[in-house]
Amino acid sequence: MAAHRPGPLKQQNKAHKGGRHRGRGSAQRDGKGRLALKTLSKKVRKELSRVDQRHRASQLRKQKKEAVLAEKRQLGGKDGPPHQVLVVPLHSRISLPEAMQLLQDRDTGTVHLNELGNTQNFMLLCPRLKHRWFFTSARPGDLHVVLDMAKVADTILFLLDPLEGWDSTGDYCLSCLFAQGLPTYTLAVQGISGLPLKKQIDTRKKLSKAVEKRFPHDKLLLLDTQQEAGMLLRQLANQKQQHLAFRDRRAYLFAHAVDFVPSEENNLVGTLKISGYVRGQTLNVNRLLHIVGYGDFQMKQIDAPGDPFPLNPRGIKPQKDPDMAMEICATDAVDDMEEGLKVLMKADPGRQESLQAEVIPDPMEGEQTWPTEEELSEAKDFLKESSKVVKKVPKGTSSYQAEWILDGGSQSGGEGDEYEYDDMEHEDFMEEESQDESSEEEEEYETMTIGESVHDDLYDKKVDEEAEAKMLEKYKQERLEEMFPDEVDTPRDVAARIRFQKYRGLKSFRTSPWDPKENLPQDYARIFQFQNFTNTRKSIFKEVEEKEVEGAEVGWYVTLHVSEVPVSVVECFRQGTPLIAFSLLPHEQKMSVLNMVVRRDPGNTEPVKAKEELIFHCGFRRFRASPLFSQHTAADKHKLQRFLTADMALVATVYAPITFPPASVLLFKQKSNGMHSLIATGHLMSVDPDRMVIKRVVLSGHPFKIFTKMAVVRYMFFNREDVLWFKPVELRTKWGRRGHIKEPLGTHGHMKCSFDGKLKSQDTVLMNLYKRVFPKWTYDPYVPEPVPWLKSEISSTVPQGGME
C-alpha cells in the first residue's frame, strides 16, 4: 500500500526559528532590575461607558450655560457693576442727542444725568428688568476718547445711517476698534422710519449687505421710537459678553466722580480721589495704578462710600413730579464721598510696590579682579589654537582685525561702543544710497507738477511744499530699498575699513553664532530682564486666577486715594475727558525691550522709516517711541528692515514698560496738522532684550576682466589696504556664484577673485557685512491729544514717472 504524499498545492507553514528570541529570564537579566510598564485596566484608567460619557458631556454643557447666565445676572445687577454701554455714531448725519434721548426711557426706570464738558452720560436704573445701564457717548473722530472708552465698555452700540451705513470717519474708527479688540457690540439703524414704506425693506436689505464686510451675520436693530429703544435695551441686557484678555486679568475703573486735594508743598501736585465701580479683578491697594494717558501712581487707601446709584433704593419716597427723577449727579457723587466714608484698605509700605522703572547702573559693576594663573594659561592655549586658524591672514593684519575674521563658521565680533554713531549711520546710509540716482533724476523731479490745478490758488494753499519734498524723498528712498536691498556705495573720501569698522562678516547668517550679551549699549544697564519670561507670565496669571487677593471686590463702588498726581488730570476731567485707571500686575512698571508683531494698515501708503517717532497704543498704555523694524522669523538673528513694508509682518522693537501679553498694538503717526494716522496694527509678542536685530550692509563691485573661474573686480574698494582688510569675507553674486578675494591688484582697489563658476559680464559681485543694532531710548509717556480725524483731500501718492 502506497504512502500518501503531499501535492504541490499543500500549505507549507514557516518553520519555527528557535534561538532568535530572548526568553523571559534573559530579558530580566538585561533589564538590570527595571520593571516593564504596566498596562492599566479600563477600571484603573477610569474610562467611562457611553452612557457616562453622555452624562458627563451634558453636565459640562449645563455648567457652561450656568456660568454664562451668572455672568449676565451679575453685570448690571444689584451685586455687580452697571452695564457700561458706549454709543458711537458712525455717520455725520446721525443725531447723537436724539438717540441718547430715546434711550432715556422714563417709563422704564429712573434716569440720572451726568453732564461734564462736551460729553453727556447718564445712568438708567430699571428695577423691573433688574438691570442698570451706564450710557456714555463718543464721536468717531475723537480718537483717544473712542479707544479709551472702548477699553472699559461692556458693550458698544454702533449707530448706522440707513443709506450708507458709515462714512470715511466711521470706517477709520472701526479699523482702530477692530485692531484694538472689540467687546460685545450691537448695531442700530437710526432714521429708517423717515423713508417711504416701500423703500424701508429695500434699504434694510442693502444696508445688511453693505455692513456684511465688517459685521457678518449680525442683526440690525432699529432706533427711531420709544418702543424700539425698549427692545434695544432688552437686547443689550441679554447679550452674551465677549471678553478682552488684556483687561480681564487686571482690575480697572471708570471714574464717575473726581476730587483733588493739593499737597502742602506744591499746589500743582496732590492727592486725587477717584470714585467708580471696580471691574475685572479684585483691586489691591498695594498694587500700582496706571491712569491712561498720564502714567503710573501709588495708592494711599481705598474707601467704600455708599453706592450713589442703587438698583433698589430703600427709604426714598417716590416723587410726585416725574421730572424730579432726573438728577444731576456730578456734585452728588462728590458729596457722598465725604459722608459715611468707610476706609476699606490702607497701603502697607512694606508690601507696596515701588515706582522704580529703571535700574540705576553701577559704574563699578564692570570691573574685574586680576585673572588667576589657570585663566592665564587657558588664555595662552586659546591664543595658540587661534593662531593656527588665522594662517591665511595677509601681512600687516592687526590683532583687532584677526579677532573678527571668519573661517569654518566660527566668528567673533568687534563691534564698537560708540552707539551714538549707530543712530547717525542709518541716515548716512540712506543719503549714500540715493546720492547717485538723485543726481540723475534731479531735473526730472524739479519739473514735476502735482496735478492740473497749478493755477488754483485755493488748492496751492493746502499744499505744504516742504512736507511734499520730504515725502518725495522718502518715497524715493523706499523705492531704492526695494530695488537694491541693503546696498551701500563705498565712500571714496573715507577708508572702508574705518567706515565699516563695527561690521563683521558671517559665513552663514542663519547658523553662524553670535553672542547676545556681547557689546551691549549703556541703555541695557537701565532695563530689567526676566530669566524666563514665559514662566513668570504663567505664574503671575495663575496667581491672579487662583489666589484670593485682599481688596475691593468686583462691583463695589469705591474711592481711590492716588498720591502725587498732577493737577492737569483733574482739569482735563472737568473739560470732559474720560478718566480711566488700570491696576498693574507685578513688574509692569519696569522698563525693558518690547517686541511687537505688526502689519502695515492697507489704508496707509506713506513710507515709514525705522527709528522714526511713532505713537504706540499697547494694551492699556499709550506712549511715543522710535522703533526698529526686523523680520519675523524663527531664527536667533533677525535682519533689520529699513522701512515698514506692506507685504509682510514685521517685528517692532522699542524700549517701553513691561506689559504681559496678550495685548493689542496700534501704531500711529502724527501729521503736521495734528491728526494721528493709523500706520500698522498687531499684537505684543514678547519682552526679550536678547532678541538680536542685525543690520546688513551690501558692498557691490563690477567684474572688470573675466577668466574661467577667476575675475578682476573693481569699484567695491578704492585702495589696496581695504582689499586686504576685507579679504577673509566671502563674496557672492546676484546670479548665485560664491567666491573669495585672492589678492589686490595695484593701488586703486582692483582685486583678483576666485569663484565656483564662470561669471557673466552683467553679473554683480556683492559682499555682506553685519552689525547688531539697538533701539533708541526715546520713550515718552506723554502723547498729545490728536485733532479730530478727517479724510485728507490731497492724495499722498507719487506719480509713477518720477520713480522710474
UniProtKB/Swiss-Prot annotation:
UniProt keywords (A-Z) are:
Nucleus, Ribosome biogenesis
Can you list the GO cellular component terms from the UniProt entry? cytosol; nucleolus; nucleoplasm
Question: What family classification does the UniProt entry report for this protein?
Answer: Belongs to the TRAFAC class translation factor GTPase superfamily. Bms1-like GTPase family. TSR1 subfamily.
Q: What InterPro entries does the database record attribute to this sequence?
A: AARP2CN (IPR012948), Bms1/Tsr1 (IPR039761), BMS1_TSR1_C (IPR007034), G_Bms1/Tsr1_dom (IPR030387)
The cross-references to PANTHER family, in alphabetical order and at most eight, read:
PRE-RRNA-PROCESSING PROTEIN TSR1 HOMOLOG (PTHR12858:SF1), RIBOSOME BIOGENESIS PROTEIN (PTHR12858)
Q: Name the GO terms of the biological process aspect.
A: endonucleolytic cleavage of tricistronic rRNA transcript (SSU-rRNA, 5.8S rRNA, LSU-rRNA); maturation of SSU-rRNA from tricistronic rRNA transcript (SSU-rRNA, 5.8S rRNA, LSU-rRNA)
**What subcellular locations does the record give?**
Nucleus, Nucleolus
Q: Where is the composition biased (Basic residues)?
A: 13-24
- What is the stated purpose of this protein? Required during maturation of the 40S ribosomal subunit in the nucleolus.
Q: Where is the composition biased (Basic and acidic residues)?
A: 46-55
- Which superkingdom, per the lineage? Eukaryota
Gene behind this protein: TSR1
Residue numbers spanned by region Disordered = 1-67
Q: What is its main location?
A: nucleus
Question: Which GO MF terms does the UniProt record name?
Answer: GTP binding; GTPase activity; RNA binding; U3 snoRNA binding
Q: Coiled-coil ranges per the record? A: none
This protein's name: Pre-rRNA-processing protein TSR1 homolog
| Residue ranges of every copy of the Bms1-type G domain listed in the record | 81-242
